[in-house]
C-alpha cells in the first residue's frame, strides 16, 4: 500500500471524486480533523468518508465497503505522474 502525502484536488475521469487531504502520514488510519474526503458524494462523519477504521481501502464508513474509488485514485495518480510536496 502506497503512502500518500498531501493529496489535494484529485479528480478521476468522471469528475465525481474530489478530496482535500492534509495528512502527513497515512498508515492504515487517518486522524486529521482538517481533512475533507468525499468519494462519489458519500461523505461520512469524521473518519467515515476515508475508510473508517478499516484502513485506506475499505471505505466501509463512507459508501458501504466499496474499494473501487481507491483503485481509481491509484490509476489516476499513475496516469498523471503527479508529485506533490
UniProtKB/Swiss-Prot annotation:
Protein name (record): UPF0512 protein R
Lineage, top ranks: Eukaryota, Amoebozoa, Evosea, Eumycetozoa, Dictyostelia
Family the UniProt entry places it in: Belongs to the UPF0512 family.
Amino acid at each position: 500500500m502506497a503512502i500518500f502525502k498531501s493529496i489535494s484536488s484529485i479528480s478521476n475521469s468522471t469528475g465525481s471524486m474530489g478530496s482535500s487531504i492534509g495528512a502527513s502520514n497515512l498508515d492504515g488510519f487517518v486522524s486529521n480533523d482538517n481533512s475533507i474526503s468525499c468519494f462519489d458524494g458519500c461523505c461520512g462523519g469524521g473518519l467515515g468518508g476515508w475508510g473508517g477504521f478499516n484502513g485506506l481501502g475499505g471505505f466501509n464508513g463512507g459508501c458501504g465497503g466499496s474499494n473501487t474509488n481507491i483503485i481509481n485514485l491509484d490509476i489516476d495518480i499513475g496516469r498523471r505522474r503527479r508529485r506533490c510536496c
